[in-house]
């Protein structure tokens, strides 16, 4: 956690993001629509969607949510791992169940309804199981887990059960695979000797449960330990080559790399 008022910190981070865009000489764009993303693809520049993980500092009336939406935020995860006024995040140690506490509060249900009204993406990645099912009940758009893996392969509380995976599939949503060692490995360790085939194993499993239209890359390049073979975002071509060597053709690779995300964002944003 970062000391200070969480709303002030969010505004500072958003200001930094906009400074990066201003200094990018047009190579980075903040996207507010699926059409914006498609233009970035055509122009061969980086497309960015502003996302907030953890709404703990938000007021319960929707003013903060409205303000960040007006500033360009189009995706939100109500929780990190800890509880806030909206409900409980997922916590607990490995191995463990995602059923770690109560679900959404009344304010949390209101938040989901406010997000629905704004047609923002809702991220379930850091929700415990009860909050997940509460969100599934109240959400009006496809469910999205931006950076989560299969609990059956790595029983971290943060990973998703088969039942949750099916619910995301049935909503028309997507799961973005997390590259963090601790969320990939069957032993739950953070060791970076994790082979890229472990990521492929999770993708295989998710596709078997959900189908190839509901799985994507999620990454989580943010303070986690990663496989040495991957390193950082520059290592993605090595992962793509590993997927090709594992039998994935270009049609499915395109879905994993961008098509599934774009389809879901179009549906969420209703464009």
UniProtKB/Swiss-Prot annotation:
The protein's GO terms of the molecular function aspect are: metallodipeptidase activity
Reading the lineage from the top rank, the first entry is Bacteria
- Gene3D superfamilies under this entry? Metal-dependent hydrolases
Question: Which GO terms are recorded in the biological process aspect for this UniProt protein?
Answer: proteolysis
Q: Which InterPro entries match?
A: Metal_Hydrolase, Pept_M19
Recorded hits in Pfam families, A to Z, give:
Peptidase_M19 (PF01244)
Q: Which family does it belong to?
A: Belongs to the metallo-dependent hydrolases superfamily. Peptidase M19 family.
Q: What is this protein called?
A: Uncharacterized protein in pqqA 5'region
Q: What is the lineage of its organism?
A: Bacteria, Pseudomonadati, Pseudomonadota, Gammaproteobacteria, Enterobacterales
């Amino acid at each position: 956690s970062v000391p200070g008022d969480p709303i002030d910190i969010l505004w500072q981070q958003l200001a930094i993001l906009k400074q990066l865009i201003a200094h990018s000489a047009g190579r980075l764009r903040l996207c507010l629509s699926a059409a914006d993303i498609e233009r970035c693809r055509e122009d061969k520049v980086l497309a960015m969607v502003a996302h907030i993980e953890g709404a703990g500092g938000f007021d319960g009336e929707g003013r903060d949510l409205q303000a960040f939406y007006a500033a360009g935020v189009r995706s939100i995860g109500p929780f990190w791992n800890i509880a806030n006024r909206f409900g409980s995040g997922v916590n607990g140690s490995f191995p463990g169940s995602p059923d770690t506490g109560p679900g959404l509060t009344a304010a949390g249900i209101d938040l989901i309804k406010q997000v629905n009204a704004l047609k923002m993406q809702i991220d379930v990645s850091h929700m415990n199981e009860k909050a997940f099912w509460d969100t599934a009940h109240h959400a009006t758009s496809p469910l999205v887990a931006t950076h989560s893996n299969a609990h059956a392969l790595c029983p971290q509380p943060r990973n998703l059960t088969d039942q949750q995976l099916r619910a995301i599939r049935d909503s028309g949503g997507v799961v973005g695979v997390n590259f963090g060692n601790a969320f990939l490995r069957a032993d739950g360790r953070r060791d970076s000797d994790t082979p890229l085939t472990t990521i492929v194993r999770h993708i295989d499993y998710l596709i078997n449960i959900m189908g190839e239209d509901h799985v994507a890359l999620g990454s989580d390049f943010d303070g986690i330990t990663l496989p040495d073979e991957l390193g950082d975002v520059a290592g993605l071509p090595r992962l793509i080559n590993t997927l090709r060597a594992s039998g994935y053709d270009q049609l499915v690779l395109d879905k994993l790399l961008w098509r599934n995300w774009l389809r879901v964002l179009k549906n969420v944003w209703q464009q």
